[in-house]
Amino acid sequence: MLNYLCLMVRNLKNIPLNGNFGEVMKKINVLYDATVVCNILKNNSARSGIFFVAYNVLLEFLKRDEFNIFLYADDGGKLEYIIKNYSEFSDCKIYKYSLFQDLCNYVFYKKIDSKLNKKHFFAKLFWHILTFFLKFLDKIQKKYFVKVKDIDVYFSPMKAVPKFVLNNKQIKKYIILHDAIPLINDYRQNANHEWYFDLIKSINCHDIYFANSISTKQDFIEYVPKINSENIIVIPLSTGKEYVKIGDIDYINQVKSKYGIPLDKKYIFSLCNLDPRKNLIFSIKNFLRFVEKNNLDNFIFVLGGACWKDFENILNENIENLGEKKDKILKIGYVDDEDMSALYSGAEMFLYPSLYEGFGIPVLEAMKCGLPVICSNTTSLPEVIGDCGIKINPYSDAEMLAAMEKMYFDRDFREECITKGIDRSKMFTWKKCVDVIQNKIIGDIWGAK
């Protein structure tokens, strides 16, 4: 009997009440846009910063007793596949807006399943034609016929709110803003950024936006005047739980061998999508100056990450033009999640002189793994690194060279950066991130009742 009473008391603690004593507030029904989470099926640049934010925020949402989470994606078949094949999502519910959607999702799921199992070419072609037709009908249906019921909140970690939700004034909308890069660099003609400019068009003064840094918030206030600055709330991002400092040299060497990194070489590490704003040619040039000036023949520069197709030829051409020195530059491509910590932990330092960041997750990853960081003093990066590394002007060769020499030769300073970086990285957690989001949603929904 006593155990039963204790259980009742414990459960009552988790039941939210409003201002009237004893009146239980019902759970908030959240429709979560998991479109980008579906990139879990890919191993390329599609699984980069925004994907990991959407993925980890969703996992944290699913832990919260205050919410009923329903998933939505542009391609419901991918959601069906993920829920059936990824254990972390096995209890998730897909929001059903019509019987026709069930048919679409089943067909889309079968197409994915057939692709992943490498079935016959003509079978793939059949599924491709069928899904193209059904996607068209599904798009028409969502645009003109769907009425969303029993949803309190629509949460998007990336994309614009779809029209079938947008016109429902009863649903409160919340969107994460990641950066203003396409606005600043004017990517309007780039088809890959069509989703981004759809988002910009949809921004208004009523919905709530979560910015991943103070820098991102300020950029949206500057470049999107119609946004209400009071409706932008800054949230701290984090990394995957697998990012830790690894001391097992044998394991580190095993991972290095997997990516073709010579075991007898020290290496400086850079991990990012290989695109122009990451300032990689600047990094390569100054790395070579560093090793030549200091006669460090046993050093190489390891570049990890998927490459933009438009930039790949430019980067490769610059590396080829190095002549004999090109052997000091090693591109290892996309790095599997489980290998990240070992590669960070095995390096001498991390270079990230990016010209623009919305947040800068790789810097935080390096800090968590005990790797000292040299990064830009621009945009959001000072918010992440604090005083735990060296911040430089990303256009200054002199500052970059001096920073590399300081980090490598001053071992006391290096150890101080490692210790401070690990401590500071503990400030950034997905729990803190979603706590901010949850408090705002609960205040808006329950506070209005």
How does the language model describe each region?
Residues 3-5, 10-12, 18-449:
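Carbohydrate transferase catalytic cores enriched for Leloir-type hexosyltransferases
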